[in-house]
């Protein structure tokens, strides 16, 4: 049974969330705290399998607690509970960069915790967080201009090999738990003249993916944006699927354009990587590079398996020891659809090697 620390300033919310967690035999709320300061005192002397952490609290909020834990070298598997607002999205991304493993959208009112499958999402996500590898989290370092410059030296060697690659290709990435932080080890190291579009399905609710795209664009050479309805995919551009909707890539000449669908969640997620991959079955690409990265569950595996029946596909899975949660890559590996397993820090160069760079600006 996993020991959980619950941190929330609302006594009523603590009671409701505690009841949900304790109803599952896998978990037990061991202790509660009503602000970050109380939680810090507890975490200085006790360890837990997971921490459910509110964002907005008096005395010390969730972000301040994460900074304090990092400053004191205290490791904890933390699940953030965030309200669904634009400010909430930005704060949540701050939390993920500071070491939180995942987040859930917490209803503003406690009585709504029984709606929209919140209880199932909470329990499933908490289970993934409790089983995440803290060592893998520590390996994912914040990106700086200096780290990009160092990696650029390696890229020059890769570019020489990639210069001769021709053809019409697409890179399609599936990622979930640990994604926002792990993507920082991939996207900023892709060149602006990458000879393919890159599409990312990151499991997130509506409102969060735009903030993620803006952050990724700010630290990357390649352009990054949230994919817009009707947009035609272009080489040298990264498109992040909008949260809360399924992304379908519709054939447009030899490429694709973006179309969103409001169909029900698939295998409990929306957007679904399976949905995106299967939409590429009649695409005009010569080859599709599928990348399955850290995350719980098996999203991506069925879609890639079906896609391989109709298209030339090269599947890269993130190597086990570099995953925060070895779930989605594990499913791909076990299904036998993986062509290569790659450590997180090498995924960008593998992408470059498989799609090449644009020659003479075209």
Language-model segment annotations:
Residues 1-3:
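Extreme N-terminal starter segment of soluble prokaryotic enzymes
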């Amino acid at each position: 049974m996993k020991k959980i620390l619950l941190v929330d300033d609302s006594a009523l919310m603590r009671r409701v969330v505690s009841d949900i967690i304790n109803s599952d035999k896998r978990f037990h709320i061991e202790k509660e705290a009503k602000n970050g300061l109380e939680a810090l005192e507890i975490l200085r002397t006790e360890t837990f399998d997971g921490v459910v952490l509110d964002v907005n609290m008096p005395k010390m909020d969730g972000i301040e607690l994460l900074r304090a834990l990092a400053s004191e070298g205290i490791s904890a598997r933390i699940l953030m509970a965030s309200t669904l607002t634009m400010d909430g999205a930005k704060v949540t991304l701050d939390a993920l960069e500071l070491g939180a493993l995942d987040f859930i959208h917490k209803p503003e009112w406690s009585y709504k915790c029984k709606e929209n499958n919140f209880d199932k999402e909470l329990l499933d996500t908490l289970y993934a967080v409790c089983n995440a590898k803290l060592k893998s989290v520590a390996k994912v370092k914040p990106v700086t201009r200096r780290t990009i410059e160092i990696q650029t030296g390696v890229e020059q060697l890769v570019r020489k090999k990639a210069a001769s690659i021709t053809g019409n290709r697409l890179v399609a990435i599936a990622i979930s738990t640990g994604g926002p932080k792990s993507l920082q080890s991939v996207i900023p190291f892709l060149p602006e003249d990458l000879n393919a579009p890159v599409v990312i399905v990151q499991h997130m609710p509506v409102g969060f993916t735009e903030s993620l795209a803006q952050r990724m664009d700010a630290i990357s050479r390649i352009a990054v944006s949230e994919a817009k309805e009707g947009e035609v995919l272009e080489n040298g551009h990264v498109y992040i699927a909008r949260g809360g909707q399924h992304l379908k890539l519709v054939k447009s000449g030899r490429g694709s354009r973006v179309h969103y669908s409001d169909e029900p969640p698939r295998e409990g997620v929306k957007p679904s990587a399976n949905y995106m991959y299967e939409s590429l079955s009649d695409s005009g690409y010569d080859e599709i590079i599928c990348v399955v990265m850290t995350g719980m569950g098996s999203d991506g595996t069925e879609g890639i398996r079906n896609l391989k029946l109709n298209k030339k596909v090269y599947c890269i899975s993130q190597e086990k020891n570099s995953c925060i949660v070895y779930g989605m890559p594990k499913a791909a590996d076990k299904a036998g659809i993986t062509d290569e397993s790659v450590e997180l820090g090498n995924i960008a160069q593998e992408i470059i090697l498989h799609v090449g760079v644009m020659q003479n600006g075209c």
